Amino acid sequence: MSKNQLPSYQVVADEMKMATLAVTPAELHGLLAGLISGGLSQQDQSWQPMLFDYTNDGMGWPSAALEQAQALFNVTSAQLTSDEMVLNLLLPNAEGEEAIFALADALSDWVNHYISGLGLAGAAFNKASEEAKEALADLEEMARLGVDEDDDLQEQAELLEQVIEHVKACTLLIHAEFGAKTSSSETPTIH
């Protein structure tokens, strides 16, 4: 897995299942992204006890699952702090008619856990800009969206892709306001 590439959804799902952790990859990624967007830096390891409390009644995770979470944290932090403004969400990549329902459910889980992560990190939305408040309101609305099985599934799939892109934009906007800034040591020195 490269520095900015997420692991596959199924790999993370299998690891969580083996560790008997009741958290989906989408929930885990959303929570970590929310913690990072809420102000935790990549060097801040306080996310681990928060993760344990939130997902496992305060009990630590098995080392393989924690390594998977650490890698996911690192990739997510790298994406959110990159100048490229690209964020990938860890969502299922299934095929077939039922895939759209699984994707919509996973997106809702991602967004709900992202919002929880913002809260756990202590993001002060009462002092936020209007844009950040609007982005949070949009996320709260998108967390309640679903797919209507009676509607045209192709049209629903296209709309869901637009919603996913809007979730990414809202996440990047919120991170730009609340997220930890990258250290200036990465800036080249001029002699």
Curated annotation (Swiss-Prot):
Record Pfam families: UPF0149
One GO cellular component term: cytosol
Family to which this protein belongs: Belongs to the UPF0149 family.
NCBIfam families linked to this entry: PRK01736.1 (NF002477), ygfB_yecA (TIGR02292)
Name of the protein in question: UPF0149 protein VV1_1551
Source organism of this protein record: Vibrio vulnificus (strain CMCP6)
